[in-house]
Every structure is written in C-alpha cells, then in structure tokens.
Amino acid sequence: MAKRLLTAFYGGTFDPIHHGHLQPVIALAQLVNLKQVILLPNHIPLHRPLPKATPQQRLRMTRLAIADTPGKLFVIDERELRRNTPSWTVETFKVLRSEYGPMAPLGLIIGQDSLLTLPQWHRSQELFELCHILVCARPGYQYGIAGYKNNNWMEYRFTDDPSALNYQPAGLVYCAETPELAISASDIRGRVHAILPYYDLLTHSVHAYINKQGLYR
C-alpha cells in the first residue's frame, strides 16, 4: 500500500480541557508526524458521571485551549457533542471510515490507562478494523506492550515503527513515549471548588473563562 497521511482523533469530556490532554498529544504528533489532530468532545460520556459544565461551555473551553496552542495542530469535530445519547467509539469510527474512505489511515488517541481496558470496550475487535490505536503514556502505568503477552488478538498488533501507521488504514497499536503529566480534570474541579491555585494546569484563556463563568464552584 502507498503511503497516506494519517488522521488522528482524540475524544473526551474535556471538563475542563487541560495540559494533561494537550501536551502528550502534541508530543505524539511530533513522533508520528501528525499534521492534524481532531478533537471529539462528547455530550454524554460512557461509564462516568455527567460533566459539570454544559456542552456549550466545554466546547468554548476547548476552542480557547486550541487557540492558546501554537500552530494549527488541533481542530474540533462537534458530532458527538450534538448527540443526546452516549457515543460508542466504534459507531463514531464507522461513520468516520465511511467519510474518509476504506484506505485512509485513521487513528484513535487514548492513554495507557485506557489501553488496559481496551479489550473490554464495546465491539473492540471491530474497532481495529476501523482505525489504529495511538497510545500516550500515563503516570503510574507501565509503558507499552506490558500486560498483553498472552492476549493473542492484541499482541501482534503492536508496532514500534510510527511510519507503519501510514501504510495501512487500521489495525496497529503504537505506544508513544510522551510526557507523563499528573493532571486530571477532576483534580482541577476540586481545586476550583476549594479555592486552590490551578492556573498552571491549563491554558491562560481556559483559566480565565472558568473564573469568569464561575464554573466548578
């Protein structure tokens, strides 16, 4: 197969979006030579409580965050935010695959923590027919293939060659050595509520927006 440009997607609640979301993905983009990462903020998350901020507020914070980020790496896709039901990743990628065509390399960005639970995801094996999995490191989680030595349908998918992601449309797992930032949205919300400093955990514009809107108080 000829080399094609990989398009990567990164979903989340982004309640609020912070450096722990953005900086590892920026590092991943440099390692994999991504020209664009498409953010997929969701409306109703799976397997976690409803967001504290409204969809409109979370979308605004996401726009502010990428405006504060140098370059034009990030863009936003609002399709999951417009849904009034939870968004299954495999269903979103079925639609994306139909839009991008059968041969375009597509990637889903997740954290090392999510990789551990990937075999339990809804129709996870079907997901590998639709996209690659690009994994960012997470604090406290062992890097890379550890834990999959006895998982036959996962182990053979791992590659340490990022260029391989451009030569097939889906099916590979690439674990990137990205910054491990111990930042979480729940910690930020807790800090806001407790009137503790948090300005260094997210971009300036998002910090200002949270204060102006009185979010998470």
From Swiss-Prot:
It is an enzyme of class 2 (transferase). Keywords: ATP-binding, NAD, Nucleotide-binding, Nucleotidyltransferase, Pyridine nucleotide biosynthesis, Transferase. InterPro entries: Cyt_trans-like (IPR004821), NadD/NMNAT (IPR005248), Rossmann-like_a/b/a_fold (IPR014729). It catalyses: nicotinate beta-D-ribonucleotide + ATP + H(+) = deamido-NAD(+) + diphosphate. Pathway: Cofactor biosynthesis; NAD(+) biosynthesis; deamido-NAD(+) from nicotinate D-ribonucleotide: step 1/1. GO terms for molecular function: ATP binding; nicotinate-nucleotide adenylyltransferase activity. Pfam families: CTP_transf_like. Catalyzes the reversible adenylation of nicotinate mononucleotide (NaMN) to nicotinic acid adenine dinucleotide (NaAD). This is Probable nicotinate-nucleotide adenylyltransferase.
